[in-house]
Amino acid sequence: MRRKSKKIKVLISEVSLRKRMASLAKEIHQATRGQDLVVVGVLKGAFVFMSDLIRHLTQPVTCDFLRISSYDARGKPRQLRLEFDLTQPIANKHVLVVEDIVDTGSSLQFIREHLLSKKPKSLKICALLKKETEKMTPVEFIGFTIKNLYVVGYGMDLNGQYRHLPYLGYLAPK
């Protein structure tokens, strides 16, 4: 049986993403004064964004990843938990967390508390997207502010699909 493909509307084009990666990297470089950074990508959604972003950074970077989950195997919501942690120490290092989207802010707050417990010298957050409805979570670097949409592409998925899209899109209403 063949699944119906959902109609995806372009929200942010591939060209706009490329331009914003360059300007965002400049903002990060200026704010961090070119310090060596440990760039921590939040899996799985941020891997494409992180890959593009670090190629624009001009200071030395090392990369690491972590993964959290807020759903069980059946897709039911549950308490946040760490599924995969950093593989290197970050004590006394400048850390930049790279997240795909800030929606409610609860995941990012969980990540921030977890990483601060490891005693970094500094901790800054960079999110590709922040929903305009989310006002409480501090994010130092934001790629784009968007409306409350379900976004796919550029590493973000819906049931494991659409990560490969070179742009950010949203599901069009029928």
What are these regions (language model features)?
Residues 1-174:
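PRPP-associated nucleotide enzymes
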